[in-house]
Amino acid sequence: MKKFIIALLISVASISFADEKNIIDSISDNNRLQKLNEFVTKSELTKNLLDYETLTLFAPLDDAFAALSAKTYYGYLNEKNRDKLQKLVNYHFVEGIYDNENIEDVITTKSINGLDLEIKKINGILYVNGAEVVEANIKFSNGMIHLTNRVLIPK
């Protein structure tokens, strides 16, 4: 019985601490977001992202990055294209918390770099600029992550 109670306390503690991770830790610790982690790290935006009070991240899964052509993928990672990389990374973040449960129909908002994003719900499925949210409402210390099936490319 003691072992059961200790195991229960450990599992409850790990659940409550999961929400205590910041956005950068949440990305780097998720094995399905390693490509996004690489982009965030190379963009040198880590400190900027930690400065926001609340954020929602529409996080492309590694498979979404794999769908990009090699030229596009490595083009963003080229040192000469840091501005483009930063624009791409920032395009996936929205200031504030956008919970899947609170979005009824269609809303337009701005990414943290000021570009428009259309978020809509169709038959209970959330989309952002046409990318499907395949897993929603992953909480971190000051916001929310929604995993998407496509990389959002700013215009």
Per-range role (PLM):
Residues 1-2, 109:
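Generic cytosolic/nucleocytoplasmic N-terminal low-complexity/intrinsically disordered segments
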Residues 2-3, 41:
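Bacterial Sec-dependent N-terminal signal peptides
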Residues 4-13:
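Sec-dependent N-terminal signal peptides
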Residues 16-155:
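Mature, structured domains of secreted/extracytosolic soluble proteins
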